[in-house]
């Protein structure tokens, strides 16, 4: 069903194989289609956008919008421990840190977690318009 690139990416997350529900959702996601996924808590929804990000061409950006800062922080820390390029962007950051993250992710891509209100900022909208945004997760 998938090319061989998916298996090393799965190993990044310590996973040998996908659940049936994840496989059903991942097929259209990898084909670049819009997908609405409804799985139970702990059902593996995050993997459905994290895994494809590892398979994207270099510089591709996945935007993850979440109003829950604790969830953003936990996911970013877990991704960083696995060597995945990820960061969160929120109002707690200094102006210079905010600008550094935007510059980095606009060029290098990865998983960027944002609170929805970040889109009110002109600097965020400008940076994202110049970036190669591959997918948006809400």
Please place each PLM-identified region on the residue numbering:
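Conserved Walker A/P-loop ATP-binding site and its immediately adjacent core
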Residues: 46-47, 60-84, 88-93, 97, ...
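Loop/turn-to-beta-strand initiation segments
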Residues: 34, 60-63, 85, 108-112, ...
């Amino acid at each position: 069903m998938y090319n061989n690139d998916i298996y090393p990416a799965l190993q990044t997350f310590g996973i040998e194989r996908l659940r049936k529900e994840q496989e059903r959702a991942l097929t259209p996601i990898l084909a670049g289609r819009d997908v609405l996924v409804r799985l139970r808590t702990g059902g593996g929804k995050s993997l459905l956008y994290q895994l494809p990000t590892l398979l994207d061409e270099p510089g591709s950006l996945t935007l993850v919008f979440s109003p829950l800062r604790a969830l953003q922080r936990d996911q970013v820390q877990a991704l960083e421990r696995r060597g995945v390029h990820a960061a969160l962007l929120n109002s707690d950051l200094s102006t210079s840190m905010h600008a550094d993250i935007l510059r980095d992710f606009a060029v290098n891509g990865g998983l960027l977690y944002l609170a929805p209100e970040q889109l009110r900022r002109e600097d965020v909208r400008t940076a994202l318009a110049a970036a190669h945004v591959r997918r948006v997760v809400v």
